Amino acid sequence: EYFAGICCLVCRRAALYRELAEKDLLTGCYNRNAYHEDTSRCKKLTNLLLFVFDLNNLKYYNDKFGHDCGDQYITDAAHILRKIFSRHGKLYRIGGDEFCVLIDDHNTCDISHLICCLRKEEAVYNASSRNIHLQIACGYAVFDSRTDADLDALQKRADQDMYENKKQLKTFSYR
């Protein structure tokens, strides 16, 4: 009995440490470590779809309202992204205001529909009485063996697409 209890405790602790190593504490999303671990195990790139996201104006909210407000911005954005994308792939927080989703097979989802859902959720969030005007720049790329030598090339194309979207969204004026 005693030995079984010790084994159970060790197993629970190991699971907790694994979760702490893979999860972002603020958002509960998978973290950069998990992203690198998952992408290093990624054997089949053929139908891979990568979405990348960047939270616009986070620095403004941190500077004007404090880091608690910035943290709220990040957690609210993560909640929206999880709501839309979690059925399709893993959501990772890979930087302070950067997220991404890896989807194994782009044929299993409608990309334009997912982006439309993201914009609708942003609008619903922003229509409520909040101090934060949430704006999530979004880019994506589908693996193309003609142009992508590896996952890094796919990431670069997704980032370029996201930066184009970020420029389009920059017309936003602060409340």
Regions of interest found by a model, annotated:
Residues 1-25, 32-43, 47:
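Signal-transducing coiled-coil linker helices
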Residues 17-37, 53-67, 75:
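Conserved nucleotide-binding and Mg2+-coordinating catalytic segments in signaling enzymes
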Residues 69-88:
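Active-site-proximal alpha-helical element of nucleotidyl cyclase-like catalytic domains
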Residues 58, 77, 99, 138:
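Hydrophobic framework residues that shape the active-site pocket
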Residues 90-93, 132:
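A short pre-motif secondary-structure segment
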Residues 112-119, 126-129, 143-174:
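Catalytic-core segments of nucleotide cyclases and related cyclic-nucleotide turnover enzymes
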Residues 73, 100-118:
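Short helix/loop segment flanking the catalytic signature motif in cyclic-nucleotide metabolism enzymes
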Residues 49-54, 91:
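Active-site-flanking beta-strand signature of metal-NTP-handling nucleotidyl enzymes
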